[in-house]
């Protein structure tokens, strides 16, 4: 038995969905532990592309069990559409269970998110996905949220109407926005509750029993380390904990259950939305990375900001997640660039710093200190083992691992399952 946590080691969009799908072959359970439909995971199976936002990426393995944990915020309408999309594709699917403790995104959460992002004077305007994620988490921690189990309780209709009416009054006072109709929204969510009912379980108990029975469990994070509410580039962050610690809190298991933590990083760096980005490239190289890597958000379609690989970031991710391995994706995107750069440190006010700063003013003033390595011209998409990679590509990966202080565990050279080069056996470490 092994339990493996897969986390993003950058600003999200690192390719966790592809790797979750790949690693799910050896897992018995695939568990999503935080975030909502602000995350986008693209999985390619036999040439068919699936874009998922809520459902764990292991859903396309019919012999597995997929779990949406208590740390996730759920938009029932989005979940329903994803299930319908998967069923329409005609592929057999894994069993799916949803935590009864997971919180629910309401229409007023989405409305509030949009209003804050559209208000020029808003202090909360940070470039969100406008999906209501932040307001839903805010209500959770203010103890004003609604859990999945609350929608299934007797008296749910009256409680829904009361909360919707109160939230509508607040939206009207602060934003002068039209209030949602309590009758209509309450009925809509009661209908959603019936759709959810067959999937709802005490998933903490389900995962605990799987671990006790010696089954392999894969915990799938959304977003990335630098979007973590506590350890990310605050306030340009998400509203949950994508870091490895979030796997325990977001699923209801103890931290000592976790055996292995894998940090996923692209062979370069990307970011969506606002905030400092020391290695950002605003030139032809940045455009090349965006075009070759198809760097557009799965959820929003926004173009991603692109830059050179930053090992100040990967070292930081290694520290806050206790990374055992690195998984490097999109190595093939670097093909054709004559010279590659890796950021090994920052220079701030004349001195070199090697640790990621918490102050945004410092991060914004940092200049990257680069090492240069030779590129390669060979097409990597047909490579099927690490040894087949060009010498320059292997040297680049080795230096990435050395500067990060974490060994390589897997390398990806394309979106397909078969374009994955394993270097470690994650589920048989004990």
Swiss-Prot record:
Pfam families membership: Adenylsucc_synt
Co-factor note (free text): Binds 1 Mg(2+) ion per subunit.
Binding-site list for Mg(2+): 13, 40
Coiled-coil residue windows: none
Disulfide bridges in this chain: none
Family under the similarity heading: Belongs to the adenylosuccinate synthetase family.
Protein name (record): Adenylosuccinate synthetase
Source organism of this protein record: Desulforudis audaxviator (strain MP104C)
Upper lineage: Bacteria, Bacillati, Bacillota, Clostridia, Thermoanaerobacterales
């Amino acid at each position: 038995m092994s339990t493996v946590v897969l986390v993003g080691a950058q600003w999200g969009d690192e390719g966790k969905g592809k790797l979750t799908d790949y690693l799910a072959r050896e897992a018995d359970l695939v568990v999503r532990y935080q975030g909502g439909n602000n995350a986008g995971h693209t999985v390619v199976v036999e040439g068919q592309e699936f874009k998922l936002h809520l459902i764990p990426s292991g859903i396309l393995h019919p012999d597995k069990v997929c779990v949406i944990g208590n740390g996730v915020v759920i938009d029932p309408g989005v979940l329903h559409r994803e299930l319908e999309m998967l069923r329409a594709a005609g592929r057999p699917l894994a069993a799916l269970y949803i935590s009864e403790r997971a919180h629910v995104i309401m229409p007023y959460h989405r409305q509030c998110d949009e209003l804050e992002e559209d208000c020029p004077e808003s202090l909360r305007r940070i470039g969100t996905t406008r999906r209501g994620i932040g307001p839903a988490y805010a209500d959770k921690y203010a103890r004003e949220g609604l859990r999945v189990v609350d929608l299934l309780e007797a008296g749910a209709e009256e409680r829904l109407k009361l909360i919707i009416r109160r939230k509508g009054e607040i939206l009207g006072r602060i934003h002068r926005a039209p209030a949602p109709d309590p009758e209509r929204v309450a009925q809509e969510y009661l209908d959603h509750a019936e759709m959810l009912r067959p999937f709802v379980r005490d998933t903490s108990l389900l995962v605990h029993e799987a671990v006790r029975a010696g089954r392999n469990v894969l915990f799938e994070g959304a977003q990335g380390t630098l979007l973590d509410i506590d350890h990310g580039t605050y306030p340009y962050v998400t509203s949950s904990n994508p870091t490895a610690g979030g796997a325990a809190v977001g699923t209801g298991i103890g931290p000592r259950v976790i055996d292995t933590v894998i940090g996923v990083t692209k062979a370069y760096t990307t970011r969506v939305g606002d905030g400092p980005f020391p290695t950002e490239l605003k030139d032809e190289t940045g455009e090349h990375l965006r075009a070759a890597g198809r760097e557009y958000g799965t959820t929003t379609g926004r173009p991603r900001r692109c830059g050179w690989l930053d090992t100040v970031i990967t070292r930081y991710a290694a520290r806050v997640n206790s990374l055992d391995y690195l998984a490097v994706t999109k190595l093939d995107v670097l093909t054709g660039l004559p010279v590659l750069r890796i950021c090994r440190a920052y220079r701030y006010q004349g001195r070199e710093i090697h640790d990621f700063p918490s102050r945004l003013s410092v991060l914004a003033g940092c200049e990257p200190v680069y090492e240069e390595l030779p590129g390669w011209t060979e097409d990597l998409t047909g490579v099927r083992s690490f040894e087949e990679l060009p010498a320059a590509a292997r040297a680049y990966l080795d230096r990435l691992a050395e500067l990060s202080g974490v060994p390589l565990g897997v390398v990806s050279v394309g979106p397909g399952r078969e374009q994955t080069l394993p270097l470690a056996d994650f589920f048989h470490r004990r």
